[in-house]
Amino acid sequence: MKIILVGCGKVGTALARQLSEEGHNVTVIDTNKARVEHISESYDVMGITGNGSSIITLSEAGIEEADVFIAVTGSDELNLLCCMFAKKAGHCHAIARVRNPSYSHELDFIKKQIGISAIINPEMAAAREISHLLRFPGASKIDTFAEGRVRLIKFTLTEAQALDGVAIREIPTRLKSDILVCAVERDGGVIIPNGNFVLRTGDQVTFLATQEKAHEFFQRIHLAVRPVRNALIVGGGAIAFYLSQELLENHVRVRIVERDPARCDVLAQALPDAQILCEDGSNREFLLSEGLTSTEAFVALTNIDEENVLLTLFAKKHSNGKLVTKINRLEFDDILAGLDLGSIVYPKYMTCDYIVQYVRALQNEAGSNIKTLYRILDDRVEALEFTVHEKSRATGVPLSQLHLKKNLLLCCITRGNEIKIPRGGDEIQVGDNVIVVTLEHGLHDLRDIVED
C-alpha cells in the first residue's frame, strides 16, 4: 500500500520503520530537514521536507495515489488540517493523532465533519490501560480483546505462587483454573510454550482468560485482585487528567502532585473531587509526608522519563503499593526491563500499534480483518484478534489437524456470547473472532497462521 506519513518525531519514526518493514511504499513529510534525512537514510522510505498541510507538498508526495494518510505531528490542529486537505486532494483513509483533552468529547463529530477514518488519542489509551492495572494490581500488563471480555495478562512468578516446577498442562486440574499460558519470558528469551513446558520461579508469564477466570486464578496463586482504593499521581498532564476521571468514577481517592501552579488551577477546576498538591514531585520529603508509604498505588506521569524512573525507584523503596511508570522514549525499553519499575506504560507504542493494526486490516477486508493488535513482551511477540469473514484453509478443520506455524498459539475463539479456550476438536467458523499469539511479525490474515 502507498502510505504518506506526516510528522517525523518518535512516533513517526517508529511507524516509518514498522510500515516499511511490512513492505509498504512509505513517504514521510516533515518541516525538519534533518529528521527527514535521518528517516529516509535509516529505512526504505521516501522523504520530503515541507508542510504536510500544503497541497503542493501533498501532491509531490503523491496524495492522489495514496491508500493511507497518517498525521502524527506535535500539533493536534495541524494533524486535523493535514487530514482534511488529504481527504480533499485524494481518496485515502486518513488517520490523525489528537491528544488535547479539550477535544475528547468531540472526536466523533470531528471524524464525521472532516471525513477522517480514525483518530487516536494515546494519552486516553494510556490512562485506560493504567486504570485496568489499578483495578487488577497483581498484573504487570493487561491487554484486552473481544470488547474487553477477554484479557491477556502478564505477571511475575514468585515462590509464593507455588507454581515452580509445574507443567502448564497441570494448571487446569491442579488449580481448577480455566486459563491458557500463552508466552513465558525466561533468561532474556521468549517462549511460546506447549503443555509440557515447566514453569520456574522468576518467569514472566503471560496468560489469556476472561476477567472472572483471571480473578479466580490470581486468588488461587495468592496475587492481589482487590482494586486499589487510593492513588498518588506525580505529574498533572493529559494522562493524569484522563486517569483521574476514570478512578474518581470508580470511587478511588486521587491525589495529584503537579509543580506548575497554572496547571494546578486547571486540574482543580476540572477535577473537583481530586486533591491537587502544588509541589515539586521530586521532593522526597514531601512525598513521604503525603503518605507515600501507605498509598495503594503510585503512578509516575511526568514528562521526563528519567524523573519517572527515579520516582518509581524511590516509591518502590518506601511503598508496597502498585507501581506504574510512564515512559515516552522507545529506545531504552530493554534497559528499563531490568529495573523492576512495576508496570511500564508506553503511550507512543499504543499509537504505533493502533495504526499498524488499522493498516493491516485494510489489506484484508475480504478474508479476515485484524480487529485488535498488540505488540507485547518488548515488541518480540504479537497478539492479534481476527474476525473471520469467509471460509479458508483455516476454517472448518479440527484444530488438531491444522498445521499451525511454529512459535504460534491459537488462544481463544469467541462465537457470539461464547468464549472458548480451544481444544484439538474445535473448529474455526465464519463469524468467529480468533485470538492468536505468535513470535512471527507481520501476520495479515487468519490464513497466515497455517503452514504453506
Task: Outline where the language-model segments fall.
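Cytosolic regulatory regions of ion transport systems
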Residues: M1-D452
